[in-house]
Amino acid sequence: MIGTFNETKLAVTQKTSHSEVRLPTVCVAILNWRGIKYLPSLLSSLLSAVNKYPGECPIVVLDNNEGDDTDRTWIRQNFPTVRVIQAPANDYLYSYNWLLQQLTEQIVILLNNDLKVDENFLLPLVKHFTNPRVFAASSRSYDWEGKQVTSGPYLFRQHRGWFYCTPDLAKQFTCHTLFACGGHMAVDREKFLDIGGFDRLFYPAYGEDIDLGFRAWQKDWISVYEPESIVYHAQSGSWNEDTSDRKAEYMTLRSNFLFQWRNLDRFPFAWLHAVYLPWLRLRKLLDGDRVWLKAYGEAKAIWQQHLISNSNVNFKDRHLSKDLKRICGTKF
């Protein structure tokens, strides 16, 4: 059986118009690595969105390309109002952890470079942060052509001891979500830094945004799915062209193991995982599923090292069932 949560009506944020409250300060931060293919579309559409936004919203490009200034030069020549910052090193999206320490805005909207945005993209996200409990808000995404919705609120699920989460594409209304998608999310900067930003346990990628959202829920901070804010995504466009589906599957599986071992260490989640994992591993051995077996082996090694390095961390005060019941895609 797949474990889900019963829906109860919960207020995601305060029902006030932006004219009645003072919006927080905001900026957009774009993570870039050799993104010249998509940057023209993203920056052009983003400038249109900024022009429609009822407040100030500077744009920052965080360039992860250390040795080549081609993108930085092109941006400065073609979009002079966009601020370009070179990251200290190519640290994948963990460069955000460094950047948000440098910025001063209350809300930072994190974007991959393989997007373009709707002109009304900004306000539906930012308005949620008039509620002090909101940690993050995520946009609705379409494919690049705008034909197919590819996002929804993420719901927690566990099937025979295996954690996974998938977007519920049918729920296209403002609601809670397990996490805000790291490729297009607005986040409260101080809260982000308070919980340590993206955890390097998941380096280089996949799963870090799930873990971030889950840790925020542990602090009683909510994440919101906001379909009125729209982006268009070129799937995996920000990765190397040689990043295969099998590699993406492997990285996702590895991160799922790490997330479960890090966060779901209470009954019944840990118990179900411990019971079913030997059976699942045997089945994968018999099937010859090398991707799964490799992901499990590497995740186990990473986790053992993590336990050694973080032996003083105490999670005894968490109440997982209570927290997870709130993460259920409830209607606003």
What would you call each of these model-derived segments?
Residues 31, 266-332:
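Non-catalytic, C-terminal membrane-associated alpha-helical segments of glycosyltransferases
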Residues 157-177:
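Short, flexible, basic/aromatic active-site loop/helix in glycosyltransferases
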Residues 178-196, 201-230:
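A short, conserved alpha-helix in the catalytic core of glycosyltransferases
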Residues 35-50:
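Short, well-formed alpha-helical segments that are part of the catalytic scaffolds
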Residues 116-155:
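Conserved donor NDP-sugar-binding/catalytic core segment of glycosyltransferases
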Residues 108:
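Short aromatic/hydrophobic "clamp" motif used to bind/position activated sugar donors
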Residues 46-86:
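Acidic donor-binding segment of Leloir-type glycosyltransferases
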Residues 86-103:
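Glycine-rich, basic loop-to-helix element that forms the pyrophosphate-binding segment
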